[in-house]
Amino acid sequence: NRGGVTGKRDYAGGVVGLMDLGRVSGCENYGDIASTDGGYVGGIAGASWGTIRDSWVKCHLSGGDYIGGVAGLGATLENCHTLVEIEEGSAYLGAVAGDVDADAAVSDNTFTSERLGALDGISYAGHAEPVDFDTLCTTPGVPESFSRLELTFVADGVVVEVVPFQYGEGIDALPEIPAKKGCSASWPDLDYTCLTASQTLEAEYTPYTSA
């Protein structure tokens, strides 16, 4: 999935919102996932009592509580890998899962994050653990799209430029913003010297005010 998903209430996921049983395998999600008035937000599933395995997530997540890179709430999570940013969340936040069921089976999951733990803020060696980005990108089966990092600059719905970067490094210059009559323009205020996640950035136009 490459399209963004925004839900109004609980259970927003890049592949499935709520999965009571079954299996999701070999999926990728690159679309940002959000809930405006709910929780249970996940890169693959909002909440899952089935199995999620062999999947990859690179996106931004936001919502209330239970927000996770693979699942907001999960049960069986195997060999999944994430590079996610949680932009907004109140409780139960994790790079792999916001939280897991009491009888959960979690194994061989990895992630890269400067500030998140794996499951509700805690990581577990061999089960859900952090690795550096270079290690993440040498994991067997890594998709090409997962390891490619880039900033997409957009103005008035039109892509101005796509700028690649290396994890933890910056970009040399910002692209020129197309002029709009009667407005000043700027890109979002961001630390462009140390970038760790792909994202789309919208030009901000501000009308001139007369004295």
Language-model-detected regions and their locations in the chain:
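Predominantly extracellular beta-rich ligand-binding scaffolds that present long acidic/polar faces
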Residues: 1-156, 208
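A detector of low-complexity, intrinsically disordered, Ser/Thr/Gly/Pro/Ala-rich segments
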Residues: 108, 175, 198, 204-207
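Compositionally biased, intrinsically disordered/low-complexity regions enriched for serine, proline
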Residues: 127, 137-140, 161, 172-175, ...
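Solvent-exposed, low-complexity, repeat-rich "mucin-like" stalks and linkers
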Residues: 151, 155-176
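A broad, low-specificity signal marking well-ordered, structured residues that form hydrophobic/aromatic
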Residues: 151, 201, 211
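Surface-exposed interfaces of beta-sheet-rich extracellular modules
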Residues: 169-200
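Beta-rich interaction/scaffold domains
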Residues: 190, 205-211
